[in-house]
Amino acid sequence: MSDRQQVTNARGERIAIVSGLRTPFAKQATAFHGVSALDMGKMVVNELLSRSELNPKEIEQLVYGQVVQMPAAPNIAREIVLGTGMDVSTDAYSVTRACATSFQSTVNVAESIMTGNMDIGIAGGADSSSVLPIGVSKKLAHALVDLNKARSFGQKLAIFRRLGLKDLLPVPPAVAEYSTGLSMGQTAEQMAKTYNISRADQDALAHRSHTLATETWNAGKLAEEVMAAHVPPYKSFIDRDNNIRENSTLESYAKLRPAFDRKHGSVTAANSTPLTDGASAVLLMSEGRAKALGYTPIGYIKSYAFTAIDVWQDMLMGPSYATPLALKRAGMELEDLTLIEMHEAFAAQTLANMQMFASKKFAEEKLGRNRAIGEIDMSKFNVLGGSLAYGHPFAATGTRLVTQVCHELKRRGGGTGLATACAAGGLGAAMIVEVE
């Protein structure tokens, strides 16, 4: 059996990434305060359809993702179809794979095209850290169910008497691993200590990310892939990511205290991604259909891979496991790539993965390879800045990475690019795209 992955349909046609679009990314409780993930998803899909000048009835499937779920609208994909003027018969379902969610939605649409069941679909993801499903304590939740069953006033009074004042306090969603209780920041601290990553190196990577992102925006490179978002009640709009430190100086990073290990830590708010609101989407077609409709795709999917590791120690190593698998399936080595886009959840996590890419010992012990994945050439790495600067709406990051690397490859005359991310649950994702 060949290790090569055939990302084509039965006619041998590649899967075309026709276009990609996202909202600006905004820090929690700023420009998108009060705007749900669903509303941002509808916003970006509507604009994607408008810019593509494609009849919405041509869309055969929409797969969309969300990490911080809205209990009132659990199938965000279907709600987007119903709220954007798309044909009501358009198939739609939702996925979630933590920070790799829109990698998954993209692959799901691609695989539907590969089977020949359809030719055109939309994939993406959205998350809001400003509109959250605020819960209640377990004791109050239990009491509310009992209250619903109680018949007499006396029974209801007895239920209320079981509750203390602290039981009535709202419970925000945990930004932590369910099975371990560890937050992502605590995991990043683990990785900084395991791989001896200094505070100075973390701050330097964050400074690089913000500096490059500022240069990218100022050069107008993101104009085609970031829409202006008008926020209800439509008296204001946002047309640029608002987390980027446009006057970043390396010295300023040293002033912050560690956020997760106050005494011995090195992970700070400045070398981590903030909680972020935003949405993104890509339009996918079979190569033949794209050409028949007159589109020039921004890229084609060459290979992809998903992996999983244990969650107790250094679980944000997903790129180091998924990348070699995606490379193998593409018949490539790391040095063959033109560009590399790695999700920067934390500077510590990013640097740990970069270190393991170059480690022969890691390759032998963890991957069963006789050579390292390869040392990353920084002239190819996150050349437009990364998540540390742009921000990270969990489900939207994957399609941001894919769209961004395709457009940059296009500007450079083509080539191959890697988009890769770690994700909660010890998950990893990688996708290789080719651009003509």
UniProtKB/Swiss-Prot annotation:
Gene Ontology biological process terms from the UniProt entry: fatty acid beta-oxidation
Localization of this protein: Cytoplasm
Keywords on record: Acyltransferase, Cytoplasm, Fatty acid metabolism, Lipid degradation, Lipid metabolism, Transferase
Catalysed reactions, as listed in the record: an acyl-CoA + acetyl-CoA = a 3-oxoacyl-CoA + CoA
InterPro entries the UniProt entry points to: Ac-CoA_C-AcTrfase_FadI (IPR012806), Thiolase (IPR002155), Thiolase-like (IPR016039), Thiolase_AS (IPR020610), Thiolase_C (IPR020617), Thiolase_CS (IPR020613), Thiolase_N (IPR020616)
Task of the protein: Catalyzes the final step of fatty acid oxidation in which acetyl-CoA is released and the CoA ester of a fatty acid two carbons shorter is formed.
Record protein name field: 3-ketoacyl-CoA thiolase
Taxonomic placement: Bacteria, Pseudomonadati, Pseudomonadota, Gammaproteobacteria, Alteromonadales
